């Protein structure tokens, strides 16, 4: 039996890719998402783990601030409750977290996530 659900999902994904303008347009959106995410996160005090010369547009790793006054679990829960997800870092020598830049993610999503993180920071500084 052929995996019809897989074939149908692939066909739909290819249709959506074509509607967006193909690989060049999708790649451009991912790169723009990445640049905007890094810019917004830097405004909030988060630095990237790797330099821009090696940063790819798929997922971005940020350093978790050493003296933030809150933990990753608190920040994760706050963001998750508001409909977004971030991921714990997998780097052993530094405290990090990751944010994906691909999929159904657009400028407005990046801006909303940045606002949620900003609100979280304000609430935790007010404690």
Name each region found by the language model.
Residues 47-78:
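Conserved PLP-binding catalytic core of the aspartate aminotransferase-like
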Residues 95-127:
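PLP-dependent enzyme catalytic core of the Aspartate aminotransferase-like
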Residues 4, 56, 80, 93-95:
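A generic structural signal for well-ordered coil/turn residues at beta-strand boundaries
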Residues 12, 16, 36-44, 74-84, ...:
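Generic non-transmembrane alpha-helical segments
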Residues 82-98:
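Conserved PLP cofactor-binding pocket of PLP-dependent enzymes
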């Amino acid at each position: 039996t052929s995996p019809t659900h897989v074939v149908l999902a692939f066909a739909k994904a290819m249709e959506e890719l074509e509607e967006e303008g193909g690989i060049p347009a999708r790649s451009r959106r991912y790169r723009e998402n990445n640049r905007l995410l890094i810019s917004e996160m830097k405004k909030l005090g988060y630095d990237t783990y790797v330099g821009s010369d090696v940063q790819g547009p798929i997922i971005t790793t940020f350093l978790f601030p050493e003296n933030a006054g809150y933990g990753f679990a608190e920040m994760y829960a706050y963001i998750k409750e508001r409909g977004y997800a971030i991921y714990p870092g997998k780097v052993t020598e530094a405290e990090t977290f990751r944010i994906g830049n691909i999929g159904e993610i657009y400028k407005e999503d990046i801006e909303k996530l940045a606002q949620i993180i900003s609100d979280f920071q304000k609430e935790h500084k007010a404690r």
